[in-house]
Swiss-Prot record:
GO terms for biological process: negative regulation of DNA-templated transcription. The keyword DNA-binding applies. It comes from Thermotoga neapolitana (strain ATCC 49049 / DSM 4359 / NBRC 107923 / NS-E). Keywords: ATP-binding, DNA-binding, Metal-binding, Nucleotide-binding, Repressor, Transcription, Transcription regulation, Zinc, Zinc-finger. This is Transcriptional repressor NrdR. One of its GO terms (molecular function) is zinc ion binding. Belongs to the NrdR family. Signal peptide: none annotated. The gene is nrdR. Its cofactor is Zn(2+). HAMAP family: NrdR. Binds 1 zinc ion. Negatively regulates transcription of bacterial ribonucleotide reductase nrd genes and operons by binding to NrdR-boxes. A zinc finger (unnamed) spans 3-34. Residues 49-139 form the ATP-cone domain.
């Protein structure tokens, strides 16, 4: 594996373990040349899935788009990269289990919101505001009220 810092091909694996959902192997590596450490993920190659955009266009599914959206929503929040990676794995697993060759962006967005709601409520509201295209303060208030109602319902 090439070191992302110095480009050397001389690296060693320090630790290997499956991700929580078993869909990938997480490897902690160290570069022999520069001594820096980095993480890699090994996944099996999936059958191509097409995403149906709002305007009807189709494009190849890209798990990195989901991950980047979640990272942005979780910015400056107490959510680790590994937690985000596991959430993305769960989303991809759900999509695979459905066996679809095409999926609408709406379905992906709802799965992302479901995972963010479990991870961090502020990140959930941030993502929802962009995903649902909030234009008024009342829309923020409504989603916060919804979260409070759900939380109160759990406490009973």
């Amino acid at each position: 594996m090439r070191c992302p810092f110095c480009g050397s091909m001389d690296t060693r694996v320090l630790d290997s373990r499956p991700t929580l959902d078993g869909a990938a192997i997480r490897r902690r590596r160290e570069c022999i040349s520069c001594g820096r450490r980095f993480t890699t993920y090994e996944r099996y190659e999936e059958a191509p899935v097409l995403v149906i955009k709002k305007d009807g266009r189709r494009e190849k599914f890209d798990r990195n788009k989901i991950k980047n959206g979640m990272i942005k929503a979780c910015e400056k929040r107490p959510v680790t990269y590994d937690q985000i990676e596991e959430a993305v794995n769960r989303i991809c697993l759900k999509l695979r289990e459905e066996g679809l060759f095409e999926v609408e962006t709406k379905k992906i967005g709802e799965l992302v919101m479901e995972e963010l709601k479990k991870l961090d409520q502020v990140a959930y509201v941030r993502f929802a505001s962009v995903y649902r295209d909030f234009r008024e303060v009342d829309q923020f208030l409504e989603i916060v009220k919804e979260l409070k109602r759900e939380k109160e319902g759990e406490g009973k």
